Amino acid sequence: MVNEVPTLKKKIIFKYFKPLLTFTKKEDPYELRVKSAPPLNIIEERKEPKKFVLCKPDGTPITLDDLSDISDSEEEEDTKLDMKDSIKEDVKDSIKEDVKDSSKEDVKDDVIEDVKGSINEEINSTCGTCSFINLKREKILNELLEMYRVEESVPYSFVPTNVPQIMYSVGEILNCINKIPFTLKLLKKDVNKIPVNYKEFKINKETIIEKATFELNKLTNTNIKRIITNLKNLNIETIQQAKYLGNLIVFKAINEPQYCNLYAMVVGALKKDFKSKEELGLHKKQTAFFGTVLTSAMKVLEEKVEWADTKVLDKNLYKNAFEYERAFEEQETERYLRKKKTLGAVNLLCDLYNLDVITLKHIQSRLNEFLNIENEEVVEVLGKFIEKIGEKMYLNDKSDYANMICSYLDACKNKYSNRVKFYIMDVLDKKKNWKKPVSKTENLFSSLIMEDEPALDTPYQYQEQVIANEEEEDSLELLKTIDNIYQDLKDAYDEEDEIMIADNFKIASNTFGKISFFSTYFSECITNSRKSKLLVPFVINFFNETNLNESELFDIINKHKEKLNELKIDFPLSQKIMSLYVINFVVDRLSKKIHMIN
């Protein structure tokens, strides 16, 4: 029997260590944005500097008595007295000799000057401190202050007098005496003086940009209404300033993707009202701000060819591994920045579409171009579009176009890398959960039992039934055509779009008949208050394109006027809409006739 080798069993023990403290970075649109919006001014407490005190060698502070009680030796006092006596005698002898030959009145001033000059010469010839040795230090300092004083009436001494003090004394400066506070007229604030606003000297563009940037930096879900009102209150003067703010919002939406939806809400709120003073005189429907947001976002997509250089770097072209790694990092950094910029613009356009700020017409041309380009990056951009706006396209009855893009992505997903392939599969899986449009009308007669239709005995009855069915089909097509005109008016962007829509009047009048089409058109305006807001002004502005005479229009209005009493039961606003339409039409006709006469 062969001896079996015993096997060693290893037991792996894993112990979970819970970290004591973790740091997480959280960016929530409901929280305050402290980093990007710091306080205007930060008040810091300043420590008062310590007082400088003169001390004796033993460490005790010097007092005023110590300054005045400094005495000299007896020998110095004797030499000082001898010098004073000798100086006085020499001066007296010189004065007597000069006065003998002159009168007292003429020589009085000269004598005083000679005495002062002789005293100064004697003092300078000897030691400079000998003549002042016996004087107190307090007196010496006061004499020095008198030499430099401005007003002779103000005494300078250590102890303040009744005269108002305008400066500190020597004792107060040396901290021998507590300082007495005094007021200077130079430091008083003039109440009547108008304060100078230094911001007025800045350029208006800089102040507006600073205010707008400051408001956008504070943007969150909680304060978005207040920030929109603050932005509307900005006094924008030129079109260039409005364009700069539009580019600023696009830049911030690209670099701050977590707040992109909020920036789209700001654009939607400022779409029509955010105009500069220069734009008010031009009378344009589209604002420069909104046009700049669209053009700058679309320009990012138009300039997108490749996010970065996709060629593979050859290691043999570099000297060492360090240079190769540095070149590879630069390539990946450039790729990341371009990808971030492109997808940021896609997010902004998708959010604008989801908020009904723009329509599919604004981005459909660029999507059609992407469908004709076979590129991994383009496929990823299309997937991003469908992921963001696919459900909204279904709700807006654009499901055919969304399904076409989804089928294109499904067909080409196997051509690219696994990352793109799995991303497209995730997007297509989300399609199952998209909401479908729900019809608002309900079938009120669903519970009733349908009866069999009676047989048509005669050919005349059969012919009448065919004519009735044809008229019903024509009326349905008429309503569908009018509804398409209304949808086109909702999506109209400029006056040029409305001119193109007005061409439908000619096509519809030729196919359905002029009278039948416009009678149905006006009945839709009267019975539907929501549609009348767009359809009625549109007919008034483009009445010349309808090929209707005023007499024909008068007959159509009279027919609807007879039905108003019946329509008021189901449509209470029909009479109001009818009167507004007639008044607006008459005013428009009269204004044009007056203009032609003038």
From Swiss-Prot:
Residues 66-79 have a biased composition (Acidic residues). It comes from Vairimorpha ceranae (strain BRL01). The gene is EIF4G. One of its GO terms (molecular function) is mRNA binding. Component of the protein complex eIF4F, which is involved in the recognition of the mRNA cap, ATP-dependent unwinding of 5'-terminal secondary structure and recruitment of mRNA to the ribosome. This is Probable eukaryotic translation initiation factor 4 gamma homolog. Residues 209-434 form the MIF4G domain. It comes from the Eukaryota. Keywords: Cytoplasm, Initiation factor, Protein biosynthesis, RNA-binding, Translation regulation. One of its GO terms (cellular component) is eukaryotic translation initiation factor 4F complex. Gene3D superfamilies: 1.25.40.180. InterPro entries: ARM-type_fold, MIF4G-like_typ-3.
